[in-house]
């Protein structure tokens, strides 16, 4: 199977967790878009759901395909969020934000009872950091914030290029009006320490480390679907099922 077909298979497996009447957080990115297309088929045949999109891009696709939408203001508590990821580690800590919607994705995930991550096998890693970490920052004081991020990372033994995300020759601007810095720190051994340190920088709006939010990962590979469940309590093992 090619990469797109793997995304479709992961999305199809996630759709099995959706039931009539659910309030759904709907992610952003190419894998999440495959889920939207499959969800739209279910809606067309009578399934009733309400979707809360994590980006204007996702909202536009949902409207085009007829998936009913709400907002977090109208629907502040969600049953399930389905979203993709740029990297997934064995504890279901994620790097997200490659699609530029990490702030809204994190807010929606936190408002959900459960979060299912869908991805192909290439996104599974032992330690996060191969994919550059997206950091959403205020436009004001950009250079000062970039320097503060580099110094904070250095205090944790991390270093590497920090680049402003560009699109069409201009700085990429998020739906919230912010810039994104992509930090190529390499291997991140202590994600929680980095998360806390980045949150302490005034110019940082949010970062792409998702810690303790994903409850299940559905991973598609050439040998089938692997379902990984997050540990339910400290010290317990993450559970793996292969279908």
Swiss-Prot record:
<comment type="pathway">
    <text>Carbohydrate degradation; pentose phosphate pathway; D-ribose 5-phosphate from D-ribulose 5-phosphate (non-oxidative stage): step 1/1.</text>
</comment>
<comment type="similarity">
    <text>Belongs to the ribose 5-phosphate isomerase family.</text>
</comment>
<feature type="active site" description="Proton acceptor">
    <location>
        <position position="105"/>
    </location>
</feature>
<dbReference type="GO" id="GO:0009052">
    <property type="term" value="P:pentose-phosphate shunt, non-oxidative branch"/>
</dbReference>
<comment type="subunit">
    <text>Homodimer.</text>
</comment>
<dbReference type="InterPro" id="IPR037171">
    <property type="entry name" value="NagB/RpiA_transferase-like"/>
</dbReference>
<feature type="binding site">
    <location>
        <begin position="28"/>
        <end position="31"/>
    </location>
    <ligand>
        <name>substrate</name>
    </ligand>
</feature>
<dbReference type="GO" id="GO:0004751">
    <property type="term" value="F:ribose-5-phosphate isomerase activity"/>
</dbReference>
<dbReference type="InterPro" id="IPR020672">
    <property type="entry name" value="Ribose5P_isomerase_typA_subgr"/>
</dbReference>
<dbReference type="InterPro" id="IPR050262">
    <property type="entry name" value="Ribose-5P_isomerase"/>
</dbReference>
<protein>
    <recommendedName>
        <fullName>Ribose-5-phosphate isomerase A</fullName>
        <ecNumber>5.3.1.6</ecNumber>
    </recommendedName>
</protein>
<dbReference type="InterPro" id="IPR004788">
    <property type="entry name" value="Ribose5P_isomerase_type_A"/>
</dbReference>
<feature type="binding site">
    <location>
        <position position="123"/>
    </location>
    <ligand>
        <name>substrate</name>
    </ligand>
</feature>
<dbReference type="Pfam" id="PF06026">
    <property type="entry name" value="Rib_5-P_isom_A"/>
</dbReference>
<feature type="binding site">
    <location>
        <begin position="83"/>
        <end position="86"/>
    </location>
    <ligand>
        <name>substrate</name>
    </ligand>
</feature>
<comment type="function">
    <text>Catalyzes the reversible conversion of ribose-5-phosphate to ribulose 5-phosphate.</text>
</comment>
<keyword id="KW-0413">Isomerase</keyword>
<feature type="binding site">
    <location>
        <begin position="96"/>
        <end position="99"/>
    </location>
    <ligand>
        <name>substrate</name>
    </ligand>
</feature>
């Amino acid at each position: 199977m090619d990469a797109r077909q793997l995304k479709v298979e992961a999305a199809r497996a996630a759709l099995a967790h959706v039931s009539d009447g659910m309030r759904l957080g709907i992610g952003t990115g190419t894998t999440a878009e495959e889920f939207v297309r499959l969800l739209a088929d279910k809606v067309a045949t009578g399934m009733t759901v309400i979707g809360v999109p994590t980006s204007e891009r996702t909202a536009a696709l949902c409207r085009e395909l007829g998936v009913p939408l709400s907002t977090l203001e109208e629907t502040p508590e969600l049953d399930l969020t389905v979203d993709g990821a740029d990297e997934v580690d064995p504890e279901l800590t994620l790097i997200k934000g490659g699609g530029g919607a990490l702030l809204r994705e994190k807010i929606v995930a936190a408002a959900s009872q459960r979060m299912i991550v869908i991805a192909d096998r290439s996104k599974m890693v032992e330690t996060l950091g191969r994919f550059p970490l997206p950091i959403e920052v205020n436009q004001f004081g950009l250079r000062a914030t970039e320097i503060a991020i580099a110094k904070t990372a250095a205090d944790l033994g991390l270093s590497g290029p920090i680049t402003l995300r560009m699109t069409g020759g201009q700085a990429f601007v998020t739906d919230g009006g912010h810039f994104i810095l992509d930090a190529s720190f390499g291997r991140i051994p202590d994600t929680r320490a980095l998360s806390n340190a980045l949150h302490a920088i005034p110019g940082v709006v949010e970062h792409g480390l998702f810690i303790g939010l994903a409850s299940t990962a559905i991973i598609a590979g050439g040998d089938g679907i692997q379902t990984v469940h997050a540990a339910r309590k400290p010290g317990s093992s993450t559970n793996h099922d292969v279908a």
